[in-house]
């Protein structure tokens, strides 16, 4: 896989996540007797952020476990494979957050929602993507058993985050009740996790034999 293939894969996966969240928003609003465009956009952008974050976990795990060894087997250097994987992750995150930002411009209070939703969404995409990356690396380094165990762990983490987010939304509203310090800390934590997973990827690609 060349660099443009990694970029293309990241873009396609991001567009699939965007389309899936949009369709889910449509289905949810069709069940609502009072359909309003502004509330439909608000609901859709919230689905986009959290669905995109969850899919970053699943997709990066799959790409790390499958596409990375495949790229090396077809002659890509370890340097090309590593940076290709990083480009995939960056393109996916950028497109998800760019789509969310553009959709927020169509809401009644775009800046109020953006001030909360974008930092939390970015943190979720980076953090869950990092977890997915670690899962893929464990599969490469220790085999299918480690990949399955990591997958189960990721599922438990995702369910826990989903339950917490659901309870928070019921209690405080979709974007309400968050202290300002969380809006600063969350993206920093997500970026830290992202960098940590990059280091683990680097060590894995350069120091371990990749099993096909």
Regions found by a protein language model. Give the residues of each.
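Short helix-to-coil transition segments within interhelical loops
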Residues: 72-77
């Amino acid at each position: 896989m060349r660099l443009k293939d990694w970029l293309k894969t990241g873009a396609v996966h991001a567009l699939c996540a965007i389309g899936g969240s949009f369709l889910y928003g449509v289905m949810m609003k069709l069940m609502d007797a009072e359909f309003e465009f502004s509330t439909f956009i608000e609901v859709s952008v919230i689905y986009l952020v959290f669905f995109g974050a969850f899919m970053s976990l699943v997709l990066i795990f799959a790409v790390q476990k499958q596409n990375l060894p495949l790229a090396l087997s077809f002659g890509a250097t370890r340097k090309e494979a590593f940076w290709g994987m990083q480009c995939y992750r960056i393109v996916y995150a950028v497109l998800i957050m760019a789509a969310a930002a553009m959709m927020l411009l169509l809401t009644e209070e775009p800046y109020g929602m953006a001030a909360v939703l974008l930092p939390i969404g970015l943190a979720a995409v980076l953090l869950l993507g990092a977890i997915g990356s670690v899962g893929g690396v464990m599969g490469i380094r220790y085999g299918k058993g480690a990949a399955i165990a990591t997958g189960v762990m990721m599922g438990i983490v995702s369910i826990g985050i989903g339950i917490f987010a659901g309870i928070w939304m019921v209690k405080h509203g979709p974007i309400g009740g968050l202290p300002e310090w969380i809006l600063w800390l969350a993206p920093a934590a997500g970026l830290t996790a992202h960098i940590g997973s990059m280091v683990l990827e680097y060590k894995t690609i350069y120091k371990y034999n990749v099993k096909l």
